[in-house]
Each structure stands twice: as C-alpha cells, then as structure tokens.
Amino acid sequence: MVVVASLLVTALVAAGVTLGILQLQSRTNPQQVNLRSGVTISEESAVTQVAARAKPAVVSVVTHDQPRLGRGSGYLVTSDGYIVTAVNVVAGSSRMTVLLTGDAKLHDARLVDYDCQTGVAVLKIDQVSRLPTLAFAPDPTALVEGQVVVVVGGPLEGGAVTPGYVSALHRPVTVTDPVTVRTVEISDTIETTAVIGSTTAGGPLLNVGGQVVGVAMQSQGSSEPGGFGLNVADITDDVQQILATGHVVVSSLGATNTDLSLQTAALGGLPEGSQLVTVDKTGPAGAAGLQPGDVITQLADVKIDAAHPLRLLLRSQFHPNQRITVTYFRAGNSTQVQLTLAGQHPSCA
C-alpha cells in the first residue's frame, strides 16, 4: 500500500511539475502575462510576493472513487489540518487525500461539513501540526471591481499562479452538492479574469496583501473566459461554525426559493426579490400562510436584491428561533406576516 501511494504521488507530482514548468515559462514573458490576464508589468512584483507567501499553505486535493482520479486545490486555515476548498472539488467523492506543499505523502482527508448554498467545503487531515495557514481578508466588503487578485493552485499543479482582475460581483453560478450530487445555484460570487481550471479550483483567491478574498471555482457549463470565486463575505461564518462545532446550521423559512433580478422580475410584472418554489406546510413559511409563487421582498427592514439574496440574508443577519417580519408580494399586493425562523443544515434543493 505504501509503495502504491508512493508511486501515485510520484506520478502526480511529475505531472504537476511539468505543468508548473510550462506555466512558469509563460509567466516569465511579460507580454504573455499581459495578454492572458490583463495584469500590468508594474503589478508583477506584488503578484510574485503574494504567490511566494501563499504557496506553503496551499494544498492539492485528490479524489479517488471516480472513473479517474480527480484533482483540485484547497488551503489551510488552521495549523492542525483544517482545509477550505470548493464543493465542486469533492462532489460525489467518498475518499479524498491531500498533498501538502513540500511533502511527498498523501494524507487521508475527511469531509467535515459543507454548504452548497455558499459553495464552501471544509476538510480535515489528522496527525499534523504547525502547518502554515492563510487568513481571510478582515473587510471582505472592501472588494471592488477592477481590483487585482491572484489564484494559487496546489503542489500537484506546480503551485500554478494566475493573476487577474475582479471583473464583476454578485454573479450567479452553478455548483454540485458533494453528497447528493445535485446542482444548486450560488447567487453571490466574484467573477475574475484569472483563468481557473479544475485543478486550481478550491484554491485561494488572494488580494495583493496576501489575504483570502475568495475561493477559486469553476462554473458548470460556463462560457465565461475567466473564473469565479466564492466570496469570503459569504463563507466566513460557515467556516467558523464548522471549526467550532463540526457542522453548519443556518436560519430557515422552511421553503426553497429562486432569486429574481430586477430585470427578470420586471419581465414577469413582479418586484425584485426571491420567489418561493416549494413550501413545507409544517415549516415557518407554511405555518404563516406563505405559498409557492410568493415573492419575498424584505426580511425585517432589509430589502432582498442582488447584493442581498434571501439565502445569504438568512445566514448573515438572522438566527434560528428569531421572530421576524416578512414582506411578500402576491397577486399584485404586498403583505407582511410575522414568523419564527427555524434552524437547519443549509438546503441544497
């Protein structure tokens, strides 16, 4: 078994080194860097420094029980082996291993918990200590369009570094639930010109200060030329909950929903908000009389819009067992109702 693992690591590292050499060669030509990512030569020094500081904390995640080996990235958030990655990296896998930077050993990893509403997953490797870590940006709301960001991949990819810009915020993308393998839309991601492949997905999206502002990810079936990132503003609470308790619990209406942009809502003669798709009759929404088709426009005094989607508001500004006022639209009329929020693992429906 040790021999097999050794051969596997050797083969994977060899492939990663080859890829890393090719990417390094392309990065040493400033014109190629500019053409690919739009990052100017004056920013190269900052990008290089960020990558050098981040690489020791970036890992490769290998999934073993698919038709072929799957490879992605992640990064350490604690010195004893907790790793943040994207749900797409581990979707459908029951056996995962992790390769640390500067290590030749594959460490068995387990999925601690995940949230397919935000797209984040947390893994754990055991019998490790004093590992380097990366920190979340202290003010993720400071992220703006046009800001320089850097994606760093794991050691199997030669620590691939891809710089780029934040091209848009609050973009919807589709990901896969790692347990049920169903797809779900995430409504608040970062779009970047940095090219993100399947092997760098799950790695950190960093600002020029070397702080994590997102988690790199691929969108299923996307035709966009760049990549996407899970916004740290949305995943921080999840990660903290998982580290503290081993699982994620968020406030819930007991209903599934789809967000309506201002443009989409206008086409249907509806207000901007979140339209209920299914309602559990025994849950808070059902007990309060809400029905499928109702459009939630406000929770308490917070309006539902592209920057404040319903699911993220429920997790960020409210808590289970809290009594709130819900404003909703039905048949041309706006109505308010009071209900008490439930607590549950984030729904992936």
Language-model-detected regions and their locations in the chain:
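Beta-strand/loop subdomains of soluble extracytoplasmic proteins
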Residues: 92-111, 130, 142-150, 158-177, ...
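Active-site region of chymotrypsin-like
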Residues: 125-136, 162-225, 234-237, 259, ...
